[in-house]
Swiss-Prot record:
Binding site for GTP: 17-24, 81-85, 135-138
Subcellular location, principal: cytoplasm
Family, similarity comment: Belongs to the TRAFAC class translation factor GTPase superfamily. Classic translation factor GTPase family. EF-G/EF-2 subfamily.
Domain tr-type G: residue ranges: 8-283
Organism: Methylocella silvestris (strain DSM 15510 / CIP 108128 / LMG 27833 / NCIMB 13906 / BL2)
Gene Ontology cellular component list: cytoplasm
Gene: fusA
Superkingdom per UniProt: Bacteria
Protein name as catalogued: Elongation factor G
Length: 691
């Protein structure tokens, strides 16, 4: 089956924003107006098409990014709806990795919020071109111009308006299109309401001309010929201006700003036009880099059907009807169902069975997928998030994704033997779907430990275990994921000697242990020359060191950011073995932890509290009482926004406390920022509790 659309007519884009900015509602309207959805789903009545997990419909937030294909003006739109809650940042990161562009939705009243900053940084990391849609222009307190200003001051973007609002709050009637210099006015707020072009209202003409002047002056910088014509008094025509805006978006030179109210059905069609006109197609983006498996050299994969096939898996989901679904993007070449391909990350073959195009939770079988397509594959055995699937004869590993470390953990105990068996299977599936969710076993108690990015993240996992997998279990209180690290360099000379008749055990190691840079991870290096430790025993040294990394000496927490260098040692021709060196290295590391000034580290969270002015003192005092460091405060409308760094250990149950002293009027967001040493007094309490 040939392509239905040329690759230059594809738009692979995501919709990203802070929680409650109206992201899912905007997507619902896009699906409605582009003809994919015949009944509009409202988030607040739990019927949105994109939010199809039970937990999402109840909580009114988007947890998993659902991929949807739809069409507008002859272009094929592959939309990824991403979650805005900070505990699900991993979902945003995964979807941005495979997108060519993004629509950043802002709440017209709230402006740039903490999670907006987070997703903006992630989009910067992957160089994702974007446009901004200032939503909720009908909301009380909506301020389009403040939102534009905050893009500059809070995320360092270069905003350029291509639309202006006509009215705001209950008087919001439509938009001014600065490219065509026309007003676009909606007749009413009903679904599918008609809209007409009109002349720009006289009272807004001067402002429209001022902002169009800024748009043109900024756009002509991108083309010398257009610039010189403009300096000679010739303004660019509509087509030229669109071409320049498209170029600006592609290279992230400036960010076009649009506005509307998705809920009131105003501004969605012009937003769709902007997606088609300005966001890049797969061929406008740089070729994806990979590593040739055979040679180890960097190679490029071009978005062409005739290139060798390569595809990146970016999401695993368990579907109640189809089983495990692997969402993947084809970067080069094409693939047919029934083909055997290579998972080059795992060096295992996979057979492509069913291939599905997804519309939220409806699905359509397809026989072939081409470069630029985003499809769901059913029945893959070994493929996980971040794995590459490719042509057997041209193996390549595409860029891998990086996932954050979990900062919070809970213990879970199944109530019966039957629950124990179900729990094991369910946790394996959940961990495969979400790389930021980890499962481990406590060595001493034998308890199963779940680790995640926040309380809500783990709440939802437990909810899924109970509802979807019918596991009945007791859940422990959330615990902080502390870490341990060395503070000084130590050199340890340790000899392991054991003689019990017959062959004995002998190994001597001299290892330098020192703190690595924060976040650099644990590193092992061998500097053995002259064979004082034969090379076949060196893996035993590394294994011994790694076995201690998982449990430090202070309170049994993982040891992080240590560099271990094997510099010398000794062996016996008969009594030395890999096991002997493993035991020696383990003992050496434990000694190093004793002598190297081990300290406890704790996760520090970036907290932003938005509160009416009356409660500012209470909020500040409470944060300081939680060992918080207030970084500053500013006004947002008539509310005060307080920024602070607070240890996670002191943030449990904060939401209830905040509600009680602000009568429910203050709210907060929190995200992991960094690890920091625990003060001595607090460290003693932690050690007493866990050691």
């Amino acid at each position: 089956m040939p392509r239905s659309h040329n690759i230059e007519d594809y738009r692979n884009f995501g919709i990203m924003a802070h929680i409650d900015a109206g992201k899912t509602t905007t997507t619902e309207r896009i699906l409605y107006y582009s003809g994919k959805s015949h009944k509009i789903g409202e988030v607040h009545d739990g019927a949105a098409t994109m939010d199809w997990m039970e937990q999402e419909q109840e909580r009114g937030i988007t947890i998993t990014s659902a991929a949807t294909t739809t069409f507008w003006n002859g272009k094929r739109l592959n939309i990824i709806d991403t979650p805005g809650h900070v505990d699900f940042t991993i979902e945003v990161e995964r979807s941005l990795r495979v997108l060519d562009g993004a629509v950043c939705v802002l709440d017209g009243n709230q402006g740039v919020e903490p999670q907006t900053e987070t997703v903006w940084r992630q989009a910067d990391k992957y160089h994702v071109p974007r446009i901004v849609f200032v939503n909720k222009m009908d909301k009380i307190g909506a301020d389009f111009y403040r939102c534009v200003d905050e893009i500059k001051t809070k995320v360092g973007g270069r905003p350029v308006c291509i639309q202006l609002p006509i009215g705001s709050e209950s008087d919001f009637k439509g938009i001014i299109d600065l490219v065509r210099m026309k007003a676009v006015v909606w007749q009413d707020e009903a679904l599918g309401a008609k809209y007409n072009d009109a002349e720009i209202p006289a009272e807004l003409l001067a402002k429209a001309e001022e902002y169009r002047h800024i748009l043109i002056e900024t756009a002509v910088e991108l083309d010398d010929d257009v610039m010189s014509a403009y300096l000679d008094g010739v303004e660019p025509d509509e087509e030229t201006l669109k071409r320049l805006i498209r170029k600006a978006v592609r290279y992230i030179t400036f960010i076009p700003i649009l506005c509307g109210s998705a809920f009131k059905n105003k501004g969605v069609q012009p937003l769709l036009d902007a997606v088609v006109d300005y966001l890049p197609s797969p061929i406008d983006r740089e070729a994806i880099k990979g590593v040739d498996v055979d040679t180890g050299e960097e190679v490029l994969r071009m978005p062409r059907d005739e290139d060798p096939f390569s595809m990146l898996a970016f999401k695993i989901m368990d579907d109640p009807f189809v089983g495990t679904l692997t969402f993947a993007r084809v970067y080069s070449g094409h693939v047919e169902s029934g083909t055997t391909v290579l998972n080059s990350t795992k060096d295992k073959k996979e057979r492509i069975g069913r291939m599905l195009l997804m519309h939220a939770n409806n699905r359509e079988d397809v026989k072939e997928a081409y470069s630029g397509d985003i499809v769901a594959l059913a029945g893959l055995k070994d493929t996980r998030t971040g794995d590459t699937l490719c042509d057997l004869s041209k193996p390549v590993i595409l860029e891998r994704m990086e996932f954050p470390e979990p900062v919070i953990e809970i213990a879970i105990e199944p109530k019966s033997k039957a629950d124990q068996e179900k729990l094991g299977l369910a946790l394996a599936k959940l961990a495969a779907e979400d790389p930021s969710f980890r499962v481990s076993t406590d060595q001493e108690s034998g308890q199963t430990i779940l680790k995640g990015m926040g309380e809500l993240h783990l709440d939802i996992k437990v909810d899924i275990l109970r509802r979807t997998y019918k596991v009945d279990a007791n859940i422990g209180a959330p615990q902080v994921a502390y870490r341990e690290r060395l503070t000084k360099r130590v050199e340890i000379d340790h000899t392991h000697k054991k003689q019990t008749g017959g062959t004995g055990q002998f190994a001597r190691v001299i290892i330098v242990f020192e703190p690595n840079e924060a976040g650099a991870g644990n590193v092992f290096e061998s500097k053995i020359v002259g064979g004082s430790v034969p090379k076949e025993f060196i893996p035993g040294v590394e294994k011994g060191i790694n076995s201690v990394m998982g449990s430090g000496i202070l309170a049994g927490f993982p040891v992080v950011d240590v560099k271990a260098t094997l510099i010398d040692g000794g062996f016996h021709d008969v009594d030395s073995s890999v096991l002997a060196f493993e035991i020696a290295a383990r003992a050496a590391f434990r000694e190093a932890l004793q002598k190297g000034g081990s300290v406890l580290l704790e996760p520090i969270m970036k907290v932003e509290v938005t509160t009416p002015e009356d409660y500012t003192g209470s909020v500040m005092g409470d944060l300081l009482g939680r060992r918080g460091q207030v970084q500053g405060q500013d006004m947002r409308g008539n509310a005060v926004v307080i920024n602070a760094m607070v240890p996670l250990a002191n943030m449990f149950g904060y939401v209830n406390q905040l509600r009680s002293f602000s009568q429910g009027r203050a709210n907060y967001t929190m995200q992991f920022d960094h690890y920091e040493q625990v003060p001595a007094g607090e460290a003693a309490k932690v050690q007493a509790k866990y050691a």
